[in-house]
Design a protein with these regions (language model features):
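Proteins that catalyze or organize thiol-disulfide redox chemistry
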Residues: 1-26, 30-55, 63-78, 82-108
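Conserved residues in the N-terminal Rossmann fold of short-chain dehydrogenase/reductase
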Residues: 58
């Protein structure tokens, strides 16, 4: 499943976001964040189940603080749902898979 995850940085973010026409879940996380690690498998499952229509990207906020600031990330995990380079929705904290799926379905 690892090949379906984009690991974005401040230098690669805009270019990579521009390449994706499908819905992109962008997970702002940190290594030390237990809730971030808890929701990661759920995000990976959703991306795998929706392959072709949804992709998963991860941004480590410790390594990319300017990118986190640019999107107003104050709590992690924060998942941005982006389409055509625009933020369409977001989720803060850990939420059930069903809630994430509803948000993805609304953007499809």
């Amino acid at each position: 499943m690892a090949e379906t995850i984009l690991h974005l940085t401040e230098s690669s973010f805009d270019e990579e976001i521009g390449k994706h026409k499908e819905v992109l879940m962008v997970d702002f996380w940190a290594e030390w964040c237990h809730p971030c690690r808890a929701i990661a498998p759920t995000l990976e499952e959703l991306a795998q189940e929706s392959k072709g229509s949804v992709s998963l990207a991860k941004v480590n906020v410790d390594d990319n603080p300017q990118l986190a600031a640019r999107y107003g990330i104050r709590s992690i995990p924060t998942i941005l749902f982006m389409k055509d380079g625009l933020v369409m929705d977001q989720v803060i904290g850990t939420v059930p898979k069903s809630q994430l799926k509803k948000k993805l379905d609304a953007l499809a």
